[in-house]
């Protein structure tokens, strides 16, 4: 029953944000060209450009992608474009993540992405990220909904959104004022939160955010042709035959990544003997 109430509140808040005033004052494509270069579908940063262009036109959006696809880089460039459209007064930006460790990683990633901006686009860094609980002033289910604070912000960015459960997402949506933008970052293919609900994956397919979700596809950590890249793609698509073929290839390959994958598979097979389903 508690989960049903949280789902209902999420739907209501998303509908209210969708029915709110249309987004105004987003930059022209000149800003996108300055930060991402001219449109080139083959460019490694093309999916980042598309994500940024989408996010500029949405009050609530999701940017999803695997590790190393540039989610933080994209959101830093999004903030730079929003600041340019906002004028000389600084945007009120809040950064948050579900855990303290995730918040610390977000701070480090944002600082790195800020340093990579062109000099004439570098504005002040947002305030340091904090945990969602701290930002919302939430101390568990004992915190009454009527006592929850409203956030004072123009933009709220939440990283590792796949870790957010139903109740936390409902509280977050309630706390973000309708005029403020909400940007959720994460990997919809990542393991869901420990508590109830694979919320982020469901939001990506919801009628409110289906057209406000951008997927980053190019990994800047490893290529799609690498062993890890091929395994990740096969796992995400549920291609069992491809996984088996990659395993057999890895068992005779000298590539360090392939050797590592082969050892992982051997360990998984051994673990399967104790009752865990084999890949």
Model-derived features with residue positions:
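Interdomain "pre-motor" coupling segment immediately N-terminal to P-loop NTPase/helicase cores
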Residues: 1-27
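N-terminal pre-P-loop "Q-motif" helix
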Residues: 40-57
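Conserved helicase motor core of P-loop NTPases
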Residues: 50, 189-279
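Hydrophobic anchor at the beta1->P-loop junction of P-loop NTPases
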Residues: 63, 95
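Conserved lysine of the Walker
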Residues: 71
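Hydrophobic positions on the alpha1 helix immediately C-terminal to the Walker A/P-loop
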Residues: 74, 78
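Inter-Walker segment of RecA-like/P-loop motor cores
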Residues: 96-152
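Walker B catalytic acidic pair
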Residues: 159-160, 186
